[in-house]
């Protein structure tokens, strides 16, 4: 019996559909997409895949970085999961060899496993959210807490981090999906970051951040996940890439990504 389910979430994309057999070798597969997706793409999904066709929503609430879309499709996909573990992947990305990632999820069930793509050293509480894995319960609770966290924000609002109790001195200035998921995941572990860091010096904060992330996250490098496609669609500079297929390219990219949690 398989112990992990890959939940491919988001609008259907040929890139992830053609990679489904690679996921199937390791576990079950659920595709959670939208009822507005191309019928031709639905026909390409193998019969062994569970498909969740969500009614497309035009959210009137906060949806910066499409966070509400990501939460909606992932949670709806989780409802169809019959295994104790889940790996969430974006529908516009793929990884051809997930053995190391899945092994990490199995070996460290009380952690959340992520990749190093855009896992930035410069900003605290900003782990990558492109692919993540863990127990079904932990991932679901993280997403539910995230919905609560963004519940009072407006549709097109960009939220300054000060509004959630953090500071631009050490975090990204705008509340991102990555930060929302991080604070929410730590909350599932009984960790209240905002309360904990009150009155800390920068040195104490840096030590707290590294210790907290290392105790609750595991990292698998993209170079250990076979051939891959990772997107950076929000890149505002048109002369720069919006996708990466080589780890060294994004390690050299000016935004920066770590190779190990020891770099934090």
What residue spans do the PLM features occupy?
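Catalytic core and acceptor-binding pocket of nucleotide-sugar-dependent glycosyltransferases
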Residues: 95-98, 112-262
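Active-site-proximal specificity loops/subdomain of glycosyltransferases
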Residues: 32-80
């Amino acid at each position: 019996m398989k112990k992990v389910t890959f939940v491919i979430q988001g609008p259907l994309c040929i890139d992830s559909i053609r990679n489904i057999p690679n996921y199937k070798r390791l576990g079950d597969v659920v595709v959670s997409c939208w009822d507005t997706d191309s019928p031709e793409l639905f026909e390409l999904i193998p019969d062994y895949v569970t498909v969740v066709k969500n009614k497309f929503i035009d959210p009137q609430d906060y949806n910066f970085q499409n966070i509400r879309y990501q939460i909606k499709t992932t949670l709806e996909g989780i409802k169809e999961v019959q295994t104790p573990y889940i790996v969430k992947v974006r529908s516009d990305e793929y990884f051809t060899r997930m053995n190391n990632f899945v092994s990490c999820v199995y070996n460290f069930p009380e952690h959340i496993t992520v990749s190093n793509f855009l896992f930035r050293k410069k900003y605290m509480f900003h782990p990558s959210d492109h692919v993540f894995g863990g127990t079904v319960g932990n991932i679901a609770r993280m997403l539910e807490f995230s919905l609560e966290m963004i519940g009072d924000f407006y549709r097109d609002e960009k939220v300054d981090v000060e509004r959630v109790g953090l500071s631009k001195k050490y975090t990204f200035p705008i509340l991102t999906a990555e930060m929302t998921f991080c604070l929410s995941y730590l909350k599932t572990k009984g960790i209240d970051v905002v309360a904990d860091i009150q009155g800390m010096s920068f040195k104490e904060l840096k030590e707290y951040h590294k210790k907290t992330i290392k105790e609750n996250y595991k990292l698998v490098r993209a170079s250990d996940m076979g051939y891959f496609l990772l997107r950076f669609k929000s890149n505002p500079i048109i002369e720069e890439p919006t996708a990466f297929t080589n780890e060294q390219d994004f390690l050299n990219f000016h935004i920066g990504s770590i190779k190990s949690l020891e770099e934090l």
